[in-house]
Regions:
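Detector for glycine-centered tight turns/loop "hinges" at secondary-structure junctions
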Residues: 53-54, 121, 129, 174
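Glycine-rich phosphate-binding loop of actin/hexokinase-like ATP-binding domains
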Residues: 98-158
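Short beta->alpha linker loops
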Residues: 83-85, 129, 212
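ATP-binding/phosphotransfer module of carbohydrate and carboxylate kinases, centering on a glycine-rich
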Residues: 1-37, 75, 141-145, 150, ...
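Glycine-rich phosphate-binding loop and adjoining helix at the ATP-binding site
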Residues: 3-103, 245-255
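Short glycine-rich anion-binding loops that position phosphate/pyrophosphate groups of nucleotides
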Residues: 46-49, 110-112, 239
Length: 260
């Protein structure tokens, strides 16, 4: 078993796609596996992905060919693709905290916001593989433009990208944080990992924003519970690394707004 934590800037550019293929090729070489024994490489990316057709409709859609086919030609192996949150959901179902439950919702709170759904032990993909775009439910009456091109999406006020934006706005408006001096230097862009670290160092401003995000996400999770009646809801993704700072507000909102 070989695991590698590789720095990679995930952007919707041809250069980023080429970089990804190079990283995967290097990884397969370092793994020292006989190429003839590699049956398939599964690549999980964010956005709208149809795992059956191999098309990605949000990222790396520069060719008329399916992204899976483009990647296979560049890497030299058979490739399948899927949405990252759905893959995380399946991972939890097979090897994670699931203990026999067959109806599950996995909430991925990272830079974006998505969910994976398992119904009767099967991952639900929807007709075109676009299920789980939780972050793009229209919730807020705001003028914040989401990266999807629409306004009012849940993700605009309840996600890692929202945390990043709100924190910068509040620090620039004079509020204090242990990240204030870091932002004032204006060197490299502030990362989500740095904000998570500040939360876990008990930075009050960062904690306050995370708790507000937890309340908003929890209210919408309550709606999902009312719709799907799952046996288990799992909170994952980058923001879950803040622990109780995000999970407790989520639980409070779920208790307040859900029927079960």
């Amino acid at each position: 078993e070989l695991k590698m934590n590789i720095p990679y800037k995930f952007e919707n550019t041809q250069e980023a796609l080429e970089k990804l293929c190079k990283l995967i090729s290097n990884f397969t070489k370092k793994a020292g596996i006989n190429p003839e024994k590699v049956l398939n490489i599964c690549i999980n990316i964010s956005g709208r992905v149809n795992p059956e057709s191999g098309y990605s409709f949000s990222m790396f859609n520069f060719s008329e060919l399916p992204l899976a086919e483009v990647l296979a030609k560049k890497i030299g192996y058979s490739v399948c693709i899927d949405n990252d949150t759905r893959a995380m959901t399946y991972g939890e179902y097979m090897q994670g905290c699931v203990k026999g439950e067959k109806n599950i919702i996995f909430v991925n709170i990272s830079w974006g916001l998505g969910i994976g759904i398992i119904i009767d032990g099967k991952v639900y993909t929807g007709k075109s593989g676009f299920s789980g775009e939780f972050g793009h439910v229209n919730v807020f009456d705001n003028e914040i433009l989401c990266h999807c091109g629409k306004k009012g999406c849940l993700e605009t006020e309840a996600s890692g990208s929202a945390l990043h934006r709100i924190l910068l706005e509040r620090i620039n408006n004079g509020e204090c944080s242990i990240l204030s001096s870091r932002i004032a230097t204006k060197e490299d862009p502030l990362t989500l990992d740095e904000i998570i670290a500040a939360v876990n160092q008990e930075d009050l401003l960062c904690i306050e924003i995370v708790e507000e995000i937890g309340q908003k996400v929890g209210k919408q999770i309550a709606g999902l519970i009312n719709l799907f009646n799952p046996e288990l809801v799992i909170i994952g993704g980058t923001l879950s690394l803040t622990g109780d700072y995000i999970t407790q507000p989520i639980k409070t909102s779920v208790r307040k707004y859900s029927l079960n």
